[in-house]
Amino acid sequence: MSAETGLGTRLRATSVMGDGVEGAQMSGQQQPAQPQPQTPMMQTPPPEIARPNQPKRQTNQLQYLLKTVLKTLWKHQFAWPFQVPVDVVKLNLPDYYKIIKTPMDMGTIKKRLENHFYWNAQECIQDFNTMFTNCYIYNKPGDDIVLMAEALEKLFLQKISEMPQEETELAVVQCKGRGRARKEQDASITPMRTRVLSGSLGDKSAVKPPVTPVSKPATPTPPAVIRAPTPPQTKPQQAHPPAITQAPISFSPIISQDVVVPTTVVPTPVPQPLANHPAVIHTAAQPAKTKKGVKRKADTTTPTTHDPLHESSPLPSDPKPPKAGPRKESGRQIRPIKKTEVPDSQLPAPPDLHPQPAPIAEKDSKTSEQLRYCAGIVREMFSKKHQAYAWPFYKPVDVETLGLHDYCEIIKHPMDLGTIKVKMENCDYKNAQDFASDVRLMFSNCYKYNPPDHEVVIMARKLQDVFEMRFAKMPDEPEEAPAPVPSPAPGPPAPSIKIPPPTSSDTSSDSSSDSESSSDSEEERAQRLAELQEQLKAVHEQLAALSQPQPNKPKKKEREKRKEKHKRKEEVEETRKGRIREPPAKKPKKSVQVSGGTPSIKKEAPPPVTRPARPAPPPAPCESSEEDTQRCRPMSYEEKRQLSLDINKLPGEKLGRVVHIIQSREPSLKNSNPDEIEIDFETLKPSTLRELERYVTSCLRKKRKPQDKIEAPTSGIVKVKSYSSSESESSSESSTSDSEESDPETAPNQKKKGHSGRESRKHHHPMQQPLIAPPPVMKPPSPTLAPSYPPPSSLDSSHPSLHHPLHPANVFEAVMQLPPDLPPHLAGQTEHCSPPHLNQHALTSPPALHNAMPQQPSRPSNRAAALPTKPARPPSASPPLPPPQPHHQPPAHVHHHHHHHHHAQPPHVLLEDDGPPSPHTGLPSYLQQLHKSQQPPTQSPIHSLLTTVKVQSQAPMAAPAQSMRHHQPLVYPPPSSSASPAPSPASSHIHQMQSPPVVPQQQPAGQAPPPPQQQQQQQQQQQHPALQGTLVSSHQHHVQHQQAKQQQVIQHHHHHHPSPRQQKQETYPGGHLREAPSPLLLHSPQVPPYPGLTHPPSPQSVQPKKQEMRGALVLQPQPLVMKEDKRHSPSVRPEGFSPGMRPEPPKVPEVLKGPSHIQPRPDLKPMDGGRPVRPPDQSLPPQGMPEKEKQKQEPKTPVAPKKDLKIKNMGSWAGLMQKPPVTPTSAGKSTSDSFELFRRQAREKEERERALKHQAEQAERMRREQERMRTREDDDVQDQTRKAHEEARRRQEQQQQQQQQHVQSNLPAAPSPAQSSQPIMDQREMARKREQERRRRQAMAPSIDMNFQSELMEIFEQNLFS
């Protein structure tokens, strides 16, 4: 009965809260039953909470029910009525036990769980269901208590759904603890509380909650009452009362303090459970209790933050918390174990990472610094900053407290941060790697024992990330590790950094597949594997680092020799030489790395293999120390900013190397996606930043180096020879190119010999072509012909071979200026067809800028310079290529024209150098034609030339070119014999020497604009042979406006790139040199061609032309391709010389329709020397054109705004022209005239286009006007019919009205006219509205002409930009 009274008193305290709900709900039912004596008899004893005779059993599901389900329900705001048994006396519920046969409450369930009353989870769940069912049975459905029970039940079911599916039995640990703790009423609960709280590290905060709740009112009395009855009471009753007072306490970290009402009693028991709890584990742990208390205070924050972790995962949270309890004891035990076993776990590391135990004294200083750094890492992991996720690792796992009996079987080498810290303080670690292996062992244990999705695993990953980040930033000094692989300091630290992530991943993978028996060996294997990987990465990095300073090999040999002779002097000399030689080392680096886009990496890999110079590290200390300081020197903000800008300048293929550098040196970014990496310079190590800086500057230096080289050749051949090997190669190549022309038969062989030279030169300039021709860069064919031919210096100095259009130096310069962004569709077209004699200088040389020339606007000539060559289609295969494009075939003379200008177009001429040249490769075009007369046509390379021409001379130059179309063949009659190839180079040199001095060296750049123009002219001539005729006189004055500029451009072009044809003709008549005017000049209507050049072609030359006509399939496709480009690649169009001009698409189809133009060959007629040839009338459409288009072409309405667009660089060109020309005045005149002609033609084309457009617009307007007229006529017809109907109806109405008037004679006369006039007025109004609407439509229709609007806008924009 005392128990009952105790219960009653206890329940009174809580019933004060419950009266409001339960009392109110049940008072109506219970009022009649008032007899008090009956109440105590009805008050049945509380349910049994222990089974002393039955063995206790604990399962994971029961543990979950206690620590997660019950804990969550207990905290719910509606839980208070269910926390204690129903007090029928207090609530006056005499019939309660009649209706409810098995009362149940959460307090009882809690006691039963704590006392291991349940055999399995199902029994406990049954008790919960009983409690809810009792509430629903006894109370009315709408009562508040029922609603509260429903809310609790919903939460209960939700938590049950998350319960582990399989029930596994756990060892029962706490019997003894409870027995000892009976001295205090709360003892039975305290062990549980300490276990739970230690699991969450809440035990530390357990001391605090009791202190705060003391302020809670009125609850101290219940504890007093509880204490009085407790001695006589049985176990169950003892356990029961504390449940009420202390249940809140056990969850104190989570429950608000007002719920922890009766905790005044708690402070005293807390130490006791802790005391006996260690006693159970190890009696020696008593002294550590005080320290535990201290630590608790430090950890008060963690329980609250990680509350949910413990709720959701009671077991997992426990493994870490126990560390809080017996930290030092278990630490002491584990430490001896670890001492015996650590060497095993670390065996792989010492041999790998410390193979040289001899110089320990030196290492000690360095490792001491590293170990100090490691001690700082440990301190940081113990700091509050990381406490939220580091706390489970502070102390060893308390196996007994947590009931983890299989822990020692699975984890053979336990480890925790406390043990690591003690070992660090005791100097047990010899180096940083030992320390790192222990830390990683701790994490791997965690991953192995816990499931991958466990909270503790997540916390371990976070903490490991922190550790790896800090460890990666360990100072680079302890680079003793590099000893196995010498020299590069940055190598070793990175590998050590890299290991951690793999170990964590390896261990986490182990965790999923761990076996009790072989776990130890697996762990050791994983560690060994990780360390081997680390070493391998270190070796790779060092190889990469060593591969860059390749030229150190000779240095090392010299050092060894010096060592033998002068050991002391050697160091000084080495330091001196190291500084001196580092720049050369870098140069080779460049050649290695830069060697063509992607190949750069391949080039780097081989050097390490060949690098046998490991013995050299001994002398290198001075240099390496300096290099180390340089590498590790921190970067300023400005340097970082500059570095980021430089990285952004790099082409795509170089960025891959940047990512590799970062990932190899930054472990945190090692596993990041290489395609997309975010770089934060603040987090990168100084050594990484320095390495990036070194690489980026080397790349950019190579990028700029080509321009320097471009200037170098301008000073002369001798200078080129003397300065750099690459330039000497280019100069030798120039000689070979010249000799190639003289001796075409030997060219193929020498090509093959010269592969390496060309390749090396290609590799020097990959940066300029990263996107353009990476595959060709790797191609071997395209040799420098240096070996067999005399160097250019052997030629007379007065013949600057560098100016030769085929000269390799020009090619070289062009290569250096290749734009990286050449459109691929242009690139692809030129690949398969470049003339072999040009191919020998494979990478076309884009024009180099001359100092004296103004800066050139972007134009196709610059773009077309570096057309990429497809490796799949080498020139050797090019001859068969032409057939696929037969429909493009222009007249046979096309080949002829193009040949004239092949050599005048450096950017295109030198496009591709793959494959041996055809037998007559080096010969000028007319000689090649003679060869062709005896050979089947295989001139596909020339096709490529034309393709390149197409690229450069796209749309903008189309118009002027057309006017020039039909005169090229007349200008250059083929020579009578195929002999005399040799004088060509000399003649070209002399010719260039005679040209104005300002221009010579800058051939590459200066010509940029003219070549495209000439080529297009040629192509258009070939495409429109039927258009030959006289130029419309109305256009002559337009052309004259541009004479000065054209004159300059063509003269410049003429000086720099006399075409091979011109060169040959210079020597043609009698072998004496002769000034050959530019092809444009010869076609100029105002300047008569030279008499010697205009005499009719010899029959020999004519016949080759005819045969060429049959055989030039290769060339024939070209013009069409160009035309198509003009139509389809507008992106290139604006870059033309005259941006305002646009191609005229209507002409293309008709021109290309058929080979009808091929037969007439009107352009082969001999020319009179004195009579200027007038260019064909541009306005005349091709023969195939429909009449409509002919009419459109006839009117030429010049548009003023576009005239000025051509004269952008007038001043600069004029400046070039004003220089005193060395050539005879006739040549100057001819060039000026040809330029004038060119300008005139360009203007005419522009005007013709405008006229065509204007005509089209007029035709459109006429069509619209006709439509309007038609609609108007239709409206008129409709109106007439309508009017006829209306008149008929009106007459009928009038007749009816008259009849009515007669019938209704009594009505006044006035209304009748009004009635008859009314419909007439309506009709008139309708007609008036219709007419207004029609006129409005008519007025509005012509007001908006979109074509006219766009034309106006275009004119405005052109004026704006001109």
Curated annotation (Swiss-Prot):
Annotated localization: Nucleus; Chromosome
Biased composition (Basic and acidic residues): 326-342, 569-585, 628-639, 1186-1207, 1236-1293, 1322-1334
Polar residues bias: start-end ranges: 926-941, 1224-1234
Biased composition (Basic residues): 553-568, 750-766, 893-905
Pro residues compositional bias, start-end: 34-49, 219-234, 348-358, 481-503, 606-621, 772-793, 871-889, 1086-1099
Source species, domain of life: Eukaryota
Keyword Ribonucleoprotein appears in the UniProt entry: no
Gene Ontology terms: biological process: chromatin remodeling; positive regulation of canonical NF-kappaB signal transduction; positive regulation of T-helper 17 cell lineage commitment; positive regulation of transcription by RNA polymerase II; positive regulation of transcription elongation by RNA polymerase II; regulation of DNA-templated transcription; regulation of inflammatory response
Span list, region BID region: 542-597
Region named Disordered: 22-57, 200-243, 274-367, 476-639, 699-941, 953-1349
Disulfide bonds: none
Biased composition (Low complexity): 504-516, 722-737, 953-963, 977-1006, 1014-1028, 1041-1050, 1308-1319
Xref: PROSITE patterns: BROMODOMAIN_1 (PS00633), BROMODOMAIN_2 (PS50014), NET (PS51525)
Family statement: Belongs to the BET family.
Domain notes: The 2 bromo domains mediate specific binding to acetylated histones. The exact combination of modified histone tails required to recruit brd4 to target genes is still unclear. The first bromo domain has high affinity for acetylated histone H4 tail, whereas the second bromo domain recognizes multiply acetylated marks in histone H3.
Name of the protein described by the UniProt record: Bromodomain-containing protein 4B
Organism: Xenopus laevis (African clawed frog)
